[in-house]
């Protein structure tokens, strides 16, 4: 494989100038992450305290990194070739075991979670590095990546065999290794560092994969809403009102992402002079944005299950933090796409913060409606901005 171009490796996607489609193998792979997101939201719901939040945050980043690194593989490599398809299915199995172990990851199933995660990250990266051989243009990047996921693996494994607080600390450092190292090009002594300009990704495909994960997270939110509704003993007016509030809140999140920016995001990464840099940036942002969706799903569950209950501090935090994190992630995302932080999102975050003292005077149902109204307001403002942007773009050709 010496001196071959990226285009000539038999396992790589063919770059013919057309948008690389998302394959059925990739969609099948994503089903594991529907389950993983469900597990995370349930874990947070049953451990709604500071320790539980930190634990869920660590586990969420592990889930996200496993998906993200695999996403980059399927951007470069063709999932319809037998060897890459087999790799995806092996990663799916490891991901399924990892997701199944989430409830006991900080207990007696920590070693199962770790072995599945390490097998997923190190095994996939080592296999790709082996397939590429020593001379392929992507080989050096994968050797550096393998070095960093191996360093992280040592921390993951060490964490599985120590007590709870030490485990949290070691796993948090392991997460940082894998999350931050791409920002600096996976630098390692003797191996150098990668440049984002060397990451010759198919931008439209990567944007679409991120968008599909947002759909996964929003879909899990609806599944949780439906499941909680089904368990309700009485479908009275407050319960039906809670259902409407949570549904409209989820709809507002969908609109803020897909209705106002998703097509422009695809265009931004496709037209960029450095799509690798923008693609990496998109992945960093989506970890925050989707984390907000997961937290919001937990808040929705509380509103539906206990509409008349007063708010404990933990309830206030989750009901405000979920939408606020989502809006912050969405604002950073739109900054990457348009170059400007949308004022509507910052107003929305401020409004959510101002609801904190109000929350202690109302019940869960009222608070659920108040946070939904904030999301709907931001969505309405963004809709107006989109219309102005569309009219401005349509008028530009006529002005020349």
Question: Where does each model-flagged region fall?
Answer:
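Predominantly late transmembrane helices and immediately cytosolic-facing juxtamembrane segments
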Residues: 2-27, 32-35, 47, 57-86, ...
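Alpha-helical transmembrane segments of multi-pass membrane proteins
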Residues: 32-42, 363
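Loop-to-transmembrane alpha-helix initiation sites
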Residues: 165-170, 362-372
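Membrane-helix boundary connector in multi-pass membrane proteins
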Residues: 336-339, 355-368
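Central hydrophobic cores of alpha-helical transmembrane segments
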Residues: 345-353, 371-374
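Alpha-helical subdomain
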Residues: 350-359, 389
């Amino acid at each position: 494989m010496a001196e071959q171009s990226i285009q000539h490796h038999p396992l790589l996607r063919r770059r013919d100038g057309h948008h690389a489609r998302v394959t059925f193998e990739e969609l099948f792979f994503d089903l594991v992450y529907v389950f993983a997101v469900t597990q995370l939201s349930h874990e947070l719901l049953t451990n709604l305290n500071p320790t539980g939040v930190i634990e869920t945050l660590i586990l969420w980043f592990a889930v996200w990194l496993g998906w993200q690194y695999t996403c980059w593989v399927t951007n470069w490599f063709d999932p319809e070739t037998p060897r890459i398809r087999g790799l995806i299915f092996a990663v799916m199995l490891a991901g399924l075991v990892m997701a199944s172990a989430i409830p006991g990851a900080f207990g007696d199933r920590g070693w199962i979670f770790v072995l599945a995660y390490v097998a997923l990250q190190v095994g996939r990266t080592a296999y790709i590095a082996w397939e590429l051989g020593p001379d392929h243009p992507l080989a050096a990047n994968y050797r550096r990546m393998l070095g960093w996921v191996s360093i992280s693996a040592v921390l993951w494994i060490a964490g599985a065999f120590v007590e709870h607080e030490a485990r949290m600390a070691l796993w948090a450092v392991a997460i940082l290794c894998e999350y931050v190292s791409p920002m600096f090009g996976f630098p390692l002594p003797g191996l150098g560092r990668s440049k984002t300009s060397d990451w010759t990704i198919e931008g439209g495909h990567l944007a679409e994969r991120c968008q599909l994960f947002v759909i996964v997270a929003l879909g899990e939110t609806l599944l949780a809403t439906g499941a909680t509704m089904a368990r309700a003993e009485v479908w009275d007016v407050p319960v039906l009102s809670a259902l409407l509030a949570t549904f409209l809140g989820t709809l507002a999140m969908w609109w803020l992402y897909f209705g106002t920016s998703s097509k422009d995001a695809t265009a931004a990464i496709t037209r960029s002079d450095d799509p690798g840099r923008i693609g990496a940036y998109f992945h960093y942002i989506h970890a925050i944005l989707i984390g907000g969706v997961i937290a919001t799903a937990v808040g929705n569950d509380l509103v539906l299950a206990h509409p008349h209950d007063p708010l404990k501090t933990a309830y206030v935090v989750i009901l405000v933090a979920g939408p606020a994190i989502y809006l912050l992630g969405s604002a950073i995302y739109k900054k990457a796409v348009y170059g400007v932080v949308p004022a509507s999102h910052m107003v929305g975050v401020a409004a959510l913060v101002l609801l904190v003292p109000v929350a202690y005077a109302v019940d869960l149902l009222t608070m659920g409606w108040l946070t939904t109204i904030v999301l709907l307001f931001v969505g309405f403002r963004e809709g107006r901005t989109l219309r102005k942007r569309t009219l401005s773009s349509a008028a530009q050709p006529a002005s020349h």
